């Protein structure tokens, strides 16, 4: 999943100003079918799992720099893990930082040679989270992450994980998106969550989660309210899987927590 910003310029203090986010990719077409098939093979207990499940994910953070850009302090890395643990606490998920790596490579720091970078740096298995912090993702992207797949090949495992713009960590330089919630959003895709809004402007059930109201458009900024599909409840402007400013995001639903637990058992647990 690609998560991007439309750049409006550089602020006086050197911060990266971002107008809004937009998505440049969609989940693999086979994902929902694979999810449904995998869910049908789970036990009734596992299939009904919810936010009480308790999932702990070993996590590796990789900091890419080009000699000048991309530096992230140890304190900011720990703050990112703490932020994710706070955000996902309501969904029963915690992240255990195993190790952080630092690599100075101008090519990788520009978002190029993703495969080469991941072959060199990826750690763990399909149940391990790797986040690559990159200062210059292409086309203004804030992040890219991969949905889980059934029966992953070794190449799929190596290419797994999330690439996130360095300036979005807590205290980072990306204005309106520097509370660590871009990583939280991207990891939602790693855990099997869709966006809460429709990708085609319809009021269909875009994310396959019953307790997120139908929403025909992404949220920009932090409005006081938004109701793009009247009759089913107001838009999920505070949900981590929308496109609001970081300050606006503070919620996963019980339905999303259940889907995370189900997808974890179907695709990642034990792999």
Swiss-Prot record:
Q: Where is the active site?
A: 186
Which EC class is the enzyme in?
hydrolase
Q: Gene3D superfamilies, from UniProt?
A: Collagenase (Catalytic Domain) (3.40.390.10)
Instruction: Name its GO BP terms in alphabetical order.
Output: proteolysis
Species: Arthroderma gypseum (strain ATCC MYA-4604 / CBS 118893)
Q: Name one GO cellular component term.
A: extracellular region
Q: Does Magnesium count among this protein's keywords? A: no
Where does this polypeptide localize? Secreted
Q: What is this protein called?
A: Extracellular metalloprotease MGYG_07913
Its EC number is 3.4.24.-
**Which positions does UniProt annotate for Zn(2+) binding?**
185, 189
Database matches in Pfam families: Peptidase_M43
Give the signal peptide as a residue range, or say none if absent. Answer: 1-19
Q: What UniProt keywords apply to this chain's record, in alphabetical order? A: Disulfide bond, Glycoprotein, Hydrolase, Metal-binding, Metalloprotease, Protease, Secreted, Signal, Virulence, Zinc
């Amino acid at each position: 999943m690609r998560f991007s910003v439309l750049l409006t310029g550089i602020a006086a203090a050197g911060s990266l100003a971002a107008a809004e986010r937009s998505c440049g990719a969609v989940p693999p077409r086979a994902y929902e079918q694979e999810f449904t098939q995998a869910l049908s093979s789970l036990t009734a207990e596992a299939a009904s799992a919810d936010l009480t499940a308790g999932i702990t994910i070993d996590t590796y953070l990789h900091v890419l720099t080009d000699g000048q850009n991309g530096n992230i302090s140890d304190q900011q890395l720990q703050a990112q893990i703490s932020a994710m643990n706070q955000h996902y606490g309501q969904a029963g998920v915690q992240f255990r930082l195993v190790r952080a790596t630092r690599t100075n490579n101008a090519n990788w720091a520009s978002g190029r040679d993703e495969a080469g970078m991941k072959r060199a740096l990826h750690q763990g298995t399909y149940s391990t989270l790797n986040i690559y912090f990159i200062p210059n993702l292409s086309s203004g992207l804030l992040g890219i992450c991969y949905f889980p797949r059934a029966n992953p090949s070794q190449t799929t495992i190596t290419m797994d994980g999330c690439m996130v713009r360095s300036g979005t960590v807590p205290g980072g330089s990306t204005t309106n998106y520097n509370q660590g919630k871009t990583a939280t959003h991207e990891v939602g895709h790693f855990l099997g969550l869709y966006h809460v809004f429709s990708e085609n402007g319809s009021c269909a059930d875009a994310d396959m989660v019953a307790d997120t109201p139908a929403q025909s458009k992404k949220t920009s900024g932090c409005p006081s309210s938004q109701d793009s599909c009247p009759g089913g409840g107001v838009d999920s402007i505070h949900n981590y899987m929308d496109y609001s400013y970081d300050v606006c995001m503070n919620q996963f639903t019980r339905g999303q927590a259940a889907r995370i637990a189900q997808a974890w058992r179907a695709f990642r647990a034990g792999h």
